[in-house]
């Protein structure tokens, strides 16, 4: 009887088509092959389609993410203090304003060390990089400057394409496929500054478990994965939000409504953004203490999650209150201006 080598392209594809999860070795082999440009475009299309049809596992994600993170541009002088990243997988189609970007600056204004890892929009929605650039923040900055900003100001922004040069070859094919793939899930997992805590939003409830397992597999101390009411990849004011809380290798599930934390329940329509100009105006007003109440409340809700994962607050209600107090000042905007000016020099 002939025993097939399990680490070959045909065997891996057959396994995926049979709805079997890949082993750690197969996952790493596949990612390394992509990074080394050893997979033909037609094979890549088949693998990406098969992974999506099967449904990705948390172990597959963590194995691939570790390889991708190791291949990123990693500064030699990584900060010694613990960092937090806040982002979503995107793909919710809700066209909200840039909630997680606002959360990053409010959290940093409250003393959390934030390494925000982001990109331009791939779907017509305004991405974090788009809105920050429009407000004057330079994107193409040296890795040393990015880390220096973090040490000096407690917040920095990593423009993803500058830190993952090995993925350049895959970009045209991913775009031509026209559907979301495993790379949309890997992006939020591979911050090159290796934060020990993270708040991560998912647009589909069936991603809650694999993404929380992936974060655990990558060794994070604390994390929150959230699927917002109404399908947001952020905690929402629209109703019951589904959570996975990771703490000391234990993952627990919880459902939290806005009213549980003293917040207004209102539809996601109230959180709509629009074009780049509109989203930039919303973000600037919000950080300046001038945003509307619903914008403040949804940012406060998500900031409370950051305060929890960072160990700053153990109680979400207290975190919401601290965030709302901050959002009634211009502290977050002043911090943005400091980061913008520092990165521009």
Swiss-Prot record:
It comes from the Bacteria. Signal peptide: none annotated. It catalyses: N-(5-phospho-beta-D-ribosyl)anthranilate + diphosphate = 5-phospho-alpha-D-ribose 1-diphosphate + anthranilate. GO terms for cellular component: cytosol. Its EC number is 2.4.2.18. SUPFAM superfamilies: Nucleoside phosphorylase/phosphoribosyltransferase catalytic domain, Nucleoside phosphorylase/phosphoribosyltransferase N-terminal domain. Anthranilate 1 binds at residues 88, 119. Mg(2+) 2 binds at residues 233-234. Anthranilate 2 binds at residue 174. Mg(2+) 1 binds at residues 100, 234. InterPro entries: Anthranilate_Pribosyl_Tfrase, Glycosyl_Trfase_fam3, Glycosyl_Trfase_fam3_N_dom, Glycosyl_Trfase_fam3_N_dom_sf, Nuc_phospho_transferase. Keywords: Amino-acid biosynthesis, Aromatic amino acid biosynthesis, Glycosyltransferase, Magnesium, Metal-binding, Transferase, Tryptophan biosynthesis. One of its GO terms (biological process) is L-tryptophan biosynthetic process. Binds 2 magnesium ions per monomer. Its cofactor is Mg(2+). It holds the Pfam family Glycos_transf_3. Belongs to the anthranilate phosphoribosyltransferase family. Homodimer. Catalyzes the transfer of the phosphoribosyl group of 5-phosphorylribose-1-pyrophosphate (PRPP) to anthranilate to yield N-(5'-phosphoribosyl)-anthranilate (PRA). This is Anthranilate phosphoribosyltransferase. It comes from Prochlorococcus marinus (strain NATL1A).
């Amino acid at each position: 009887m002939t025993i097939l080598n399990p680490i070959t392209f045909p065997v891996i594809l057959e396994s995926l088509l049979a709805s079997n999860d890949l082993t750690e070795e197969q996952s790493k082999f596949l990612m390394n092959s992509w990074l080394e440009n050893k997979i033909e475009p037609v094979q890549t299309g088949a693998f990406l389609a098969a992974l999506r049809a099967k449904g990705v596992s948390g172990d597959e994600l963590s194995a691939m993410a570790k390889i991708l993170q190791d291949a990123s541009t990693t500064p030699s002088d990584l900060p010694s203090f613990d960092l937090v990243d806040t982002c979503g997988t995107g793909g919710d189609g809700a066209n909200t304003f840039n909630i997680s970007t606002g959360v990053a600056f409010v959290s940093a204004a409250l003393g959390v060390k934030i390494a925000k890892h982001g990109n331009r929009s791939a779907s017509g929605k305004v991405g974090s990089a788009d809105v920050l650039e429009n407000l004057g923040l330079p994107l193409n900055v040296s890795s040393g400057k990015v880390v220096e900003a973090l040490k000096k100001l407690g917040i920095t922004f990593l423009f993803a394409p500058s830190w993952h040069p090995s993925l350049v070859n895959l970009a045209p094919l991913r775009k031509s496929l026209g559907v979301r793939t495993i790379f949309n899930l890997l992006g939020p997992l591979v911050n090159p500054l290796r934060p020990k805590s993270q708040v991560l939003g998912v647009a589909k409830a069936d991603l809650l478990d694999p993404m929380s397992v992936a974060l655990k597999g990558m060794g994070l101390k604390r994390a929150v994965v959230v699927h917002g009411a109404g399908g947001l990849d952020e905690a929402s004011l629209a109703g019951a939000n589904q959570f996975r809380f990771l703490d000391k290798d234990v993952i627990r599930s919880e459902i939290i409504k806005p009213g549980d934390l003293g917040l207004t329940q209102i539809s996601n329509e109230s959180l709509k953004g629009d074009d780049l100009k509109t989203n930039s105006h919303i973000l600037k007003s919000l950080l300046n203490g001038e945003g509307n109440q619903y914008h403040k409340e949804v940012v406060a809700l998500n900031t409370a999650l950051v305060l929890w994962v960072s160990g700053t607050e153990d109680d979400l209600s207290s975190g919401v209150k601290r965030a709302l107090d901050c959002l009634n000042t211009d502290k977050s905007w002043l911090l943005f201006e400091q980061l913008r000016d520092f990165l521009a020099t």
